[in-house]
């Protein structure tokens, strides 16, 4: 099984929160992994996503739970892009262009997403009004449960970066009660720490050229395409039948999808050849069948 080294310069964090001897290697998903993905549902999304990612990683001098959430998302994007050929992007539908009123459908590839790299590695913020120093951290996989609560809540989002033993809600209340300048300073410091995949995509209308900003909701629930066990087994059986290949659970899934494309082309070519033979046979049959006008009837 091949593993690819992830360079720190490619990570949203630039590796600034990992030791210099840390090494992250990743492989694509196998048939076994995609079968496990078939058990995916909303209630177990985080658990299965974490288990699949952990299976596909080789870590040196780094614990899985200490991976930054921004880097986790990058690694999941890598996994999706390099595992799946047919569903490596997101389908965007805009009901109505604001200019020409045309509906827009476009597939956005994952490599179209812009990465916001870390600007500052701050681990404290001094609040002058309270005369205290607030310890800060970058959220990691350990904080994933809390991170699920912060969507559309600015205070909970900021609270995620405070490194104390208080609950997320207690940290949020502390932030809400800060005086103006202390709040501004804390928010500015944390905003400069933030990094990750930029979720706003510019979509161009094919009719009038109008550019529309679309914000994608990217979460564990929609990170991967869910294929049923029945579909997986049917695909493997089909490849075995037409390509005479024995696909095991250790096969990289991307190779299975490539074989599927080859088999589909084989079937298409065979069908086209069959249609040609049928057409040829009909043509020959018609050539040997005398027309009614040329048949001489005996006189009575």
What are these regions (language model features)?
Residues 1-92, 96-280:
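An amphipathic, hydrophobic-aromatic interaction surface with interspersed Lys/Arg
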């Amino acid at each position: 099984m091949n593993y690819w080294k992830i360079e720190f310069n490619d990570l949203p964090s630039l590796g600034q929160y990992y030791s210099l001897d840390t090494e992250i290697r990743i492989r694509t998903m196998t048939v076994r992994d995609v079968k496990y993905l078939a058990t995916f549902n909303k209630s177990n999304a985080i658990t299965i996503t974490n288990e699949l990612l952990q299976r596909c990683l080789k870590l040196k001098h780094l614990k899985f739970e200490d991976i930054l959430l921004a880097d986790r998302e990058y690694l999941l994007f890598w996994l999706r892009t390099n595992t799946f050929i047919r569903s490596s992007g997101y389908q965007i539908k805009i009901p109505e262009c604001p200019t020409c009123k045309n509906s827009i459908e476009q597939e956005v590839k994952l490599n179209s997403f812009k990465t916001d790299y870390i600007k500052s590695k701050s681990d404290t913020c001094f609040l002058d009004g309270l005369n205290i120093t607030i310890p800060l951290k970058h959220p990691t996989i350990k904080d994933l449960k809390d991170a699920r609560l912060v969507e559309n809540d600015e205070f909970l989002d900021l609270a995620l970066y405070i490194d104390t033993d208080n609950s997320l809600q207690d940290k949020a209340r502390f932030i809400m009660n800060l005086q103006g300048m202390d709040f501004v300073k804390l928010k500015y410091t944390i905003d400069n720490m933030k990094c990750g995949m930029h979720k706003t995509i510019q979509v161009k209308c094919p009719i009038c050229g109008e550019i529309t900003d679309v914000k994608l909701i990217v979460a564990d629930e929609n990170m991967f395409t869910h294929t049923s066990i029945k579909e997986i087994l049917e695909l493997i059986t089909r490849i075995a039948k037409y390509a005479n290949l024995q696909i095991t659970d250790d096969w990289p899934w991307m190779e299975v999808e490539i074989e599927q494309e080859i088999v589909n082309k084989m079937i298409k070519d065979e069908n086209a050849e069959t249609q040609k033979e049928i057409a040829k046979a009909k043509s020959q049959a018609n050539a040997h069948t005398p027309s009614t006008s040329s048949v001489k009837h005996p006189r009575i």
